[in-house]
């Protein structure tokens, strides 16, 4: 729900104990607080191909003060207002979005998020595909293709908190990984499925 960077957020955990944040949250100066990043993100979300729908949330998820979020919100709100006035996007509460979703989809539909340009100019592009059964991520970098994520969604898999309450200040919810480039990578080697061609050599 953060409005995560579809190209760079995923690898932002590699080699560290905690995953950093590259998202639309206005407190993050290199993303939600950066005009260049916000304009790129909005183009990716609102102009590039998707399936059933594309969406993002705006605002600040955690309790930061106005001083931390002022710059980012002053960048984002006028850009959203301009797209809203042109009829390019809807701006609504999460409650209304949930109602719209229920009215239009009896089950979770396939969706896709695409980022076909790279604001860092490192020749990366990505497609995230999601369905009620699985999610997968394709990453193109230069002339290579890597499947860096496939997670299966299985309602039969009970969470650790289904039969008993959590007793710590941290909860971990998981899905079934087929490929987990975030958790399985090191700083030296990014994990993923790569398409290879065998030559006579």
What does each of the following model-derived ranges do?
Residues 54-56, 89, 127-129, 136, ...:
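A broad, low-specificity signal marking well-ordered, structured residues that form hydrophobic/aromatic
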Residues 101-140:
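Surface beta-strand/loop "capping" patches
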Residues 60-64, 136, 143-144:
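Short, solvent-exposed loop/turn segments at secondary-structure junctions
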Residues 41-44, 70, 132, 144, ...:
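Short, isolated positions within intrinsically disordered regulatory regions of eukaryotic proteins
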Residues 37-40, 66, 100, 128, ...:
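A residue-identity detector for tryptophan
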Residues 138-201:
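Acidic-aromatic substrate-binding/catalytic surfaces of carbohydrate-active enzymes
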Residues 1-97:
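Catalytic grooves of carbohydrate-active enzymes
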Residues 94-96, 134, 141-143:
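An acidic- and aromatic-residue-enriched active-site/binding cleft used to recognize and process polar
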């Amino acid at each position: 729900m953060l409005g995560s960077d579809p190209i760079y957020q995923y690898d932002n955990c590699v080699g560290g104990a905690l995953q950093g944040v590259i998202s639309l949250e206005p407190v993050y100066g290199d993303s939600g607080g950066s005009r260049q990043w916000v304009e790129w993100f909005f183009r990716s979300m609102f102009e590039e191909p998707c399936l059933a729908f594309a969406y993002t949330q705006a605002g600040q998820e955690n309790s930061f003060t106005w001083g931390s979020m002022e710059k980012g919100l002053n960048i984002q709100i006028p850009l959203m207002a301009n797209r809203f006035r042109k009829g390019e996007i809807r701006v609504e509460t999460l409650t209304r979005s949930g109602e719209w979703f229920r009215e239009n989809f009896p089950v979770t539909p396939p969706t896709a998020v695409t980022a076909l340009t790279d604001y860092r100019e490192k020749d990366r592009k990505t497609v995230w595909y999601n369905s009620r059964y699985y999610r997968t991520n394709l990453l193109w970098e230069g002339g290579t293709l890597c499947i860096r994520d496939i997670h299966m969604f299985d309602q039969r898999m009970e969470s650790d908190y289904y039969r008993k309450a959590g007793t710590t200040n941290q909860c971990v919810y998981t899905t079934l990984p087929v490929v987990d480039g975030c958790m399985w990578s090191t700083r030296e080697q990014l994990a993923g499925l790569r398409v290879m061609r065998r030559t006579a050599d």
